[in-house]
């Protein structure tokens, strides 16, 4: 199974962003995911896109969710996503 890249767009000091990262990191080996954190603080384009929505979560470049992460929903999304690759 190919490893998926999970990108979390957030800001420094964002507690929801930290929560999402801390929820996924312990699952990364089991779920075969690489976690990529992107801070939007100094990027006007990303700030315009995601400024009020962080954390924003993408899987292999495809939008999954924003504000929160339900681990079971994430696992289901990941499984369906991989079936269509």
Regions found by a protein language model. Give the residues of each.
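Local sequence-structure signature of Cys/Sec-based thiol-disulfide redox active-site neighborhoods
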Residues: 2-26
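Generic recognition of short, well-ordered alpha-helical segments
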Residues: 18-22, 48-49, 69
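A short, hydrophobic beta-strand/beta-hairpin element that forms part of a small beta-sheet core
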Residues: 55-63
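Short helix-capping segments at alpha-helix termini
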Residues: 28-32
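Non-catalytic, surface beta->alpha helical segment in thiol-disulfide oxidoreductase systems
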Residues: 62-85
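Short Fe-S-cluster ligation motifs
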Residues: 42-56
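Thiol-based oxidoreductase modules, predominantly thioredoxin-like and allied folds used
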Residues: 33-44
């Amino acid at each position: 199974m190919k490893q998926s890249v999970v990108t979390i767009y957030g800001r420094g000091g964002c507690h929801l962003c930290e929560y999402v990262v801390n929820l996924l990191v312990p699952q990364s080996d089991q779920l075969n995911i690489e976690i990529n954190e992107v801070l939007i603080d100094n990027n006007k384009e990303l700030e315009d896109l995601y400024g009020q929505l962080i954390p924003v979560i993408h899987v292999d470049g495809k939008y999954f969710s924003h504000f929160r992460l339900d681990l079971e929903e994430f696992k289901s999304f990941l499984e369906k996503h991989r079936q269509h690759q």
